Amino acid sequence: MSDPRARLTLGIAAIALALYAVFFAGDYALHVLTRAGIYAIAAIGYQLIFGRLGALSLAQGCFFGLGAYAAGLGALELGLGFPLTLAVGILLPSLLAALIAIPVLRLASHYFALATLGIAQLALLVATNWTAVTGGANGLYGVPPIDIGSVSFGHGLPLTLLVWACVGLALTLSHRMTAGKRGLAVETLREAPLAAAALGVDGAAIRFRFFVASAALGGLAGALQAHAIGVVSPDVLQFHVLVLILAMTVIGGRASPLGAVLGALLLVHLPEWFRDFADYYLVVYGAALLAAIIFLPRGLAGLFGKSKMPPVETADAEAPRDPAPLTLSVETVSKRFGGVTALDGTSLTLAPGEILGLIGPNG
């Protein structure tokens, strides 16, 4: 977000969203905005690994669900308050990502995707069958609302503002990880890994940091989800959660964290606009994803990108009026060493200060 236009657009959008939430949105609209903010955090995290590094991870839904379960169990079983449940919700997915990163990130792209999908499915099986801890298919009920000291953020406007403040923190983290030379290193690693290695870019360390940061933001989103709705069930680990986060990232613009926010706002509101087609939401998401790929290859964020500047007309360069005198002039020189012809009719001229290398059969 170093582009001034992008910062201005983000600032205007944030102010407009805050004004809408404070003065115009009802309780249900605030609930939808809260859900959009939660998924925006998960999508910003996914944009780090998928958009920036180009690695198709299928475990972001797993990290989202793990964060929700960690926060729910921390509140219900350990009696932890909100700041601590939030920390647990971030820490547990981050630790899992750190443990699996070393073997998984060494895999080629399609094997990496399959490995992360296997981890996600394993997490779903554990959540469904480990009834003594996770509640099985019934899940966890009664996760307390968010209270910070004597201030309640349980629902309505306070919860919405808190969630979107976390969106701002997620955007800040993403920006700090991809700004300046770090961003150039990441882009080089994505487009030309061999060139990046030749330039001294530590690709393994970058992939590790981005994978763990992606999981941490997924866990943060899941923890907020658990407190926002008070229920955690195996549904948070289902494949459709990943599909939703992936669609948000692509439709919004995989190259931009702001695009992830725009994609979340759009796709969370789509079911509200098309309630009559609620049973076909995956079809709607698929159609929106296909349309974005065809008509908006840079996503919604591409609509706010830098405009192309017209080419600058330049005058033809004039030849120097007083050319420098020649120091050396060679015409049609030939040289043979036995049966090897080193030079055959070679001509060249050298001006003062000019350096010329002549490479023949012997180097």
Predicted regions and their residues:
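Single transmembrane alpha-helix segments in multi-pass membrane proteins
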Residues: G26-E77, L99-L114, V186-A197, D202-G203, ...
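Transmembrane alpha-helical segments in multi-pass inner-membrane proteins
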Residues: G61, A97, R207-F295
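Alpha-helical transmembrane segments within multi-pass membrane transporters and channels
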Residues: L78-Q121, L262-G263
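Extracellular/periplasmic helix-loop junction at the C-terminal end of a transmembrane helix
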Residues: I119-F153, G183, P297-S307
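Conserved structural motif at the start of ABC-family nucleotide-binding domains
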Residues: L328, L343-G345
